[in-house]
């Protein structure tokens, strides 16, 4: 009996050690750039803010990574962190998807909101989390966006929302679609209050998010190479039966056609935001 007990502990310890070694190997593996196929050391990519050093392809950031990149150290104060979705329409498998998304992303929902400062400039911030069901907009995402806007109005401070989304969350049906009108309405009040709203579009920003709050800002910024649009290019091509222009729906194309105001490299993001906030508040 004693022998068996020791054997189990030894096996458990060995198993944990092997798992740890496997995790370390995964972390150390080089990453292939999806744009230029360059092999990049994971540490080098992290040091370069997850931007390919050869072709400048911008890899996705988690919401927490983007917050750390943009705001002053220890200035972020999250609010509404306890809000999370539930299966209000009894959609098959939705509850399991929510639980899995929370586990994988470490976030309770598809957006994180809070108060922060950028070089001392106070603002309300919302950052979408692509790791949570592709940051699709359901009832809770819409509610958190609205509460962030209302908080900015109450404090009379600027609002910054960083978008990346696959669109409305299909598992919530019309409730998800209603969030487009809901967020647009509260932003209309924000605009009437004369306050500054900056929108940062990252890869990808599509569907109901691109057709609502992401496109209603006073200043619209975008990261290079981001896919931005309502329907995807393949759907549009099949619908109209024509070849699409090169780089169609990419941020560079939208800049050329007056749909966004400025392309911002990730390394310049905080400085650019600081300048815009300084001009507005100064």
From Swiss-Prot:
A zinc finger (C4-type) spans 33-55. It is found in: Cytoplasm. Its EC number is 2.1.3.15. Pathway: Lipid metabolism; malonyl-CoA biosynthesis; malonyl-CoA from acetyl-CoA: step 1/1. Keywords: ATP-binding, Cytoplasm, Fatty acid biosynthesis, Fatty acid metabolism, Lipid biosynthesis, Lipid metabolism, Metal-binding, Nucleotide-binding, Transferase, Zinc, Zinc-finger. Zn(2+) binds at residues 33, 36, 52, 55. Residues 29-282 form the CoA carboxyltransferase N-terminal domain. Pfam families: Carboxyl_trans, Zn_ribbon_ACC. PANTHER family: ACETYL-COENZYME A CARBOXYLASE CARBOXYL TRANSFERASE SUBUNIT BETA, CHLOROPLASTIC. Component of the acetyl coenzyme A carboxylase (ACC) complex. Biotin carboxylase (BC) catalyzes the carboxylation of biotin on its carrier protein (BCCP) and then the CO(2) group is transferred by the transcarboxylase to acetyl-CoA to form malonyl-CoA. Belongs to the AccD/PCCB family. This is Acetyl-coenzyme A carboxylase carboxyl transferase subunit beta. It comes from Syntrophomonas wolfei subsp. wolfei (strain DSM 2245B / Goettingen). The gene is accD.
